[in-house]
């Protein structure tokens, strides 16, 4: 053994080849400070052994290296610039040391080689991957850029255009794509990985492969003609900005860094990378996106823990077909859990199966599936007009019409047809789980399972705990949602649960602006372009359906009359009474048609303005800051109330619910990250300015106390 630490082992193989194996004590290899130090020491030991003729890097885990240890980032990024720069420079000495060894080197890549893992393999002369490999530099998704030489080495290995596409998108690349651009040199079956890597390394040692020229290319400036470089970077800037937009600076920084470093050698190019990394690491965007990543890990960790308590789900059933039922059936079947789709009407079953078939066909068209897999998934969906096939289900998802009496009747009915220990859930967006539980003989096996529409796209599932729901029931539904590929958050029962409860105060703020004469299109523009929502409130209401919104608003008003009760008609009432339900009947705040490519098209409609003007009078202009304040303050305060009341367990879960369930702008991190960034005291002062608008604008006593103590929600958690 040449070297051994808790994360790295180096042994000498025959023919004087050193084998460095990453083998951390946890479930995955990642580049934390300890691993970087170990790699440095291992390379020193290798360099001191004069008999070594080549080096092979491998991993003892199912993944090569998943990246840097992101849990270290927030603390590290809070350090002084000099400390952060010193960390970057010291880490890069290690990667340079790997690249500068006096003999050929190769990486044998299995599973994920992401971020620092990808930067490690780029520092070796050759790269062989097996068919399980996924390679990429996802740092821009965290609001930063690669910091261990990724922007320097990748363009010199795969070319500028390919490197720009890889790094700015942050996407994992399949091994076939990596082979096509030259990021890897060979692609083999998993069982052939080490033997193929050793053969290539021996060929390099025997001078059959020119490793010196390859290495020299990575150390030198990019060989790019000046005119071609100008055109390439100008095109890239336009394309990247179009996708990333102004709120996400990291992808544009990548283009700038590679452009600035193009004429520099490795040392100069690394300095350019370090300065850009330093600048981005200090941004609020990076703090927010890293926070989302860590929150996601926390939520997934809770789901994994729930799996230990959970009842095994081998089969499922959904009651109510149609678009929603079909979406749930597709999601369950495509992730490996067979499901019965039960309805009382054959046309509804046909619609549900049609929805599942359409989603699967789209996967085949994109190359993400094939006809054989599509057939297998469809075979996992059993349509039924009676309860006979439902009897074997371990979990039942009731997804019938959003009406308490209908749901209660169906729930009572299905309880008679399933096993004693089957779990029953309701996919309701507004109806109290405690109320629905009254229709069941065994309410302990019942909870809510709120999917968001469209099911296949929206990552969130709210698992709603009723007062009688058992821990096993909740854990089993969390585990089933995770198995379906969803992110579950557990919330306690209340009107609107969590997501809808905080959404409707936002809509109330929007309605208040319209009642004061604001232009809904102007509000949408501010909330989309400036605040960063994917849709403004008017457009979102049209997509949700103003009939659905009208019903949910009534539920919220009944549940929280002191804050959400209405004294008169609002804009949602106006649209509902005019039977302008949104996209579903092609007219809401906007009017909808189909363009030449068959895609929905949104246009302003004079009728909407006439209806609103008739109710609220002449239009008037509002400043952007007031629009943002009047829509966001109610949502933020209601989110805080949910935390204080125990509806949601933590700021992290609340923020994930908002980002995954509503599309809250990720670069702002969620309500609690946004509050902490803004400063709770600053928010309280802003809310007080609008407190005269009613209860939705009045902060809680606990918020005032936190503000007075200069506290923050994540620090408190």
From Swiss-Prot:
Region described as 3-hydroxyacyl-CoA dehydrogenase: 311-717
EC code: 4.2.1.17, 5.1.2.3, 5.3.3.8, 1.1.1.35
Pfam families given in the database record: 3HCDH, 3HCDH_N, ECH_1
Residues annotated for substrate binding in this entry: 296, 500, 660
Any single GO CC term annotated in Swiss-Prot or TrEMBL for this entry: fatty acid beta-oxidation multienzyme complex
Source taxon at top rank: Bacteria
Entry keywords, A to Z: Fatty acid metabolism, Isomerase, Lipid degradation, Lipid metabolism, Lyase, Multifunctional enzyme, NAD, Oxidoreductase
Protein name as catalogued: Fatty acid oxidation complex subunit alpha
Organism: Shewanella piezotolerans (strain WP3 / JCM 13877)
């Amino acid at each position: 053994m040449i070297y051994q630490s808790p994360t790295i082992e180096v042994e000498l193989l025959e023919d004087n080849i050193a084998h460095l194996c990453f083998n951390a004590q946890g479930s995955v290899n990642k580049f934390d400070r300890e691993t970087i130090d170990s790699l440095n020491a291992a390379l020193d030991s290798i360099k001191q052994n004069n008999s070594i003729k080549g080096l092979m890097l491998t991993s003892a885990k199912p993944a090569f290296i998943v990246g840097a240890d992101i849990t270290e980032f927030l603390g590290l990024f809070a350090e002084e610039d000099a400390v952060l720069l010193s960390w970057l420079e010291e880490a890069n000495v290690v990667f340079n040391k790997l690249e500068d060894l006096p003999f050929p080197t190769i990486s044998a890549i299995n599973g994920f080689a992401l971020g620092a893992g990808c930067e490690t393999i780029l520092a070796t002369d050759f790269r062989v991957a097996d068919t399980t490999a996924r390679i990429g530099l996802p740092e821009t998704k965290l609001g930063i850029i690669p910091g261990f030489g990724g922007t320097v080495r990748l363009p010199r290995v795969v070319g500028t255009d390919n490197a720009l596409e890889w790094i700015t998108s942050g996407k994992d690349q399949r091994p076939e794509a990596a082979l096509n651009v030259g990021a890897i040199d060979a692609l083999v079956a998993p069982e052939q990985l080490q033997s193929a890597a050793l053969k290539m390394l021996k060929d390099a040692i025997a001078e059959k492969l020119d490793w010196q020229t390859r290495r020299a290319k990575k150390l030198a400036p990019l060989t790019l003609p000046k005119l071609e470089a100008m055109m390439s970077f100008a095109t890239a800037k336009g394309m990247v900005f179009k996708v990333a937009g102004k709120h996400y600076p990291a992808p544009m920084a990548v283009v700038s860094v590679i452009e600035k470093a193009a004429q520099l050698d490795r040392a100069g190019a690394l300095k350019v990378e370090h300065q850009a990394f330093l600048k981005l690491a200090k941004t609020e965007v990076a703090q927010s996106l890293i926070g989302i990543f860590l929150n996601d890990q926390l939520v997934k960790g809770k789901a994994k823990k729930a799996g230990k308590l959970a009842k095994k789900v081998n089969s499922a059933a959904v009651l109510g077909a149609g678009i929603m039922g079909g979406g749930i059936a597709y999601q369950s079947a495509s992730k490996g859990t067979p499901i019965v789709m039960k309805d009382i009407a054959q046309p509804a079953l046909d619609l549900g199966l049609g929805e599942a078939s359409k989603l699967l066909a789209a996967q085949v068209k994109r190359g993400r599936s094939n006809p054989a897999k599509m057939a297998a998934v469809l075979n996992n969906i059993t349509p039924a007009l009676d309860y006979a096939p439902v009897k074997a289900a371990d979990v039942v998802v009731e997804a019938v019409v959003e009406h308490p009496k209908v749901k209660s009747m169906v729930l009572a009915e299905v309880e008679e047809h399933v096993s004693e220990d089957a779990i029953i859930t309701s996919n309701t967006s507004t109806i109290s789980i405690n109320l629905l539980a009254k229709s069941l003989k065994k309410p302990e096996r019942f909870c809510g399972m709120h999917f968001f529409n469209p099911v296949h796209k929206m990552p969130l599932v709210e698992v709603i705990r009723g007062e009688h729901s058992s821990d096993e029931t909740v854990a089993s539904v969390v585990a089933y949602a995770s198995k379906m590929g969803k992110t579950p958050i557990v919330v306690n029962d209340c009107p609107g649960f969590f997501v809808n409860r905080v959404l409707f105060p936002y809509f109330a703020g929007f309605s208040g602006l319209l009642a004061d004469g604001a232009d809904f299109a102007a509000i949408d523009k501010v909330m989309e372009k400036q605040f960063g929502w994917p849709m403004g409130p008017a457009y979102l209401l049209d997509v949700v359906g103003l009939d659905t919104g009208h019903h949910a608003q009534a539920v919220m008003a009944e549940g929280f009359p002191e804050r959400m009760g209405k004294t008169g008609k609002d804009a949602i009432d106006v649209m509902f009474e005019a039977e302008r339900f949104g996209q579903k009947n092609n007219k809401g705040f906007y009017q909808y048609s189909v363009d030449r490519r068959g895609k929905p098209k949104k246009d302003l409609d004079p009728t909407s303005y006439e209806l609103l003007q008739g109710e609220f009078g002449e239009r008037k202009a509002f400043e952007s800051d007031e629009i943002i304040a009047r829509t966001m303050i109610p949502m933020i305060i209601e989110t805080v109330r949910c935390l204080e009341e125990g509806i949601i367990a933590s700021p992290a879960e609340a923020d994930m619910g908002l980002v995954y369930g509503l599309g809250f702008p990720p670069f702002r991190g969620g309500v609690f990250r946004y509050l902490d960034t803004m400063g709770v005291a600053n928010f309280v002062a802003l809310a007080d300015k609008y407190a005269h608008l009613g209860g939705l604008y009045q902060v809680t006593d606990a918020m005032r106390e936190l503000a007075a103590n200069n506290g923050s929600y994540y620090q408190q958690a």
